[in-house]
């Protein structure tokens, strides 16, 4: 009888997924204000400068940067990921975005990570901003930067239209990809 409940009841699985994700979320993280998002983005940028050697070169060379701090992923067979962040151009926030992705397969656990996408060309930035829901790998290819020994970033990717970093990962799921990540503009007021 127990086996039938676990194998046939998707509600149980969804409840467990929600429970795992909730364990990693601050109580108000799903309803952040613009001010709260900006504060989290500022902290993530400071972490980026501290953890990634050569970070300044990416910031200076980019036309804009999407900063998604504390993106949370939880999984128990079915996985989900969510986070909110800001697009900054010239050091100022111009728009707010969320990222959502889902997956099915053998997986269990949870993690939190920071994501920064650098738009290195005006065309890549324009296409991102015009999109209703921009998906990594579909609407634009992201060159994920590997951080070498001593925390130094490989700056040869500066010539790619979109460069991505996944850093400050904490948790039990070692996932540094952006596969399936969808970024959607939010309607947030100051």
Model regions and ranges:
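Small-residue-enriched, tightly packed secondary-structure blocks
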Residues: 31-190
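Short, flexible active-site loop motifs that bind/organize anionic cofactors or intermediates
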Residues: 1, 27, 115
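Bacterial N-terminal signal peptides
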Residues: 13-26
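Bacterial N-terminal signal peptides that target proteins for export
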Residues: 2-15
């Amino acid at each position: 009888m127990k086996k039938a409940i676990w194998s046939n009841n998707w509600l149980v699985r969804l409840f467990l997924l929600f429970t795992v994700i909730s364990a990693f979320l601050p109580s108000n993280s799903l309803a952040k204000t613009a001010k709260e998002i900006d504060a989290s983005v500022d902290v993530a940028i400071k972490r980026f400068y501290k953890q990634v050697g050569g970070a300044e070169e990416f910031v200076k060379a980019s036309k804009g940067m999407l900063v998604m701090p504390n993106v949370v992923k939880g999984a128990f067979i079915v996985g989900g990921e969510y986070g909110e962040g800001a697009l900054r151009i010239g050091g100022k926030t111009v728009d707010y975005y969320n990222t959502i992705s889902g997956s099915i397969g053998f997986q269990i656990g949870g993690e939190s990570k920071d994501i920064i996408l650098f738009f290195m060309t005006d065309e890549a930035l324009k296409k991102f901003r015009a999109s209703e829901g921009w998906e990594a790998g579909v609407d634009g290819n992201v060159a994920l930067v590997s951080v070498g020994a001593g925390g130094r970033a490989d700056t040869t990717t500066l010539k790619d239209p979109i460069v991505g970093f996944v850093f400050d990962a904490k948790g039990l799921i070692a996932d540094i990809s952006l596969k399936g990540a969808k970024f959607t503009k939010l309607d947030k007021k100051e």
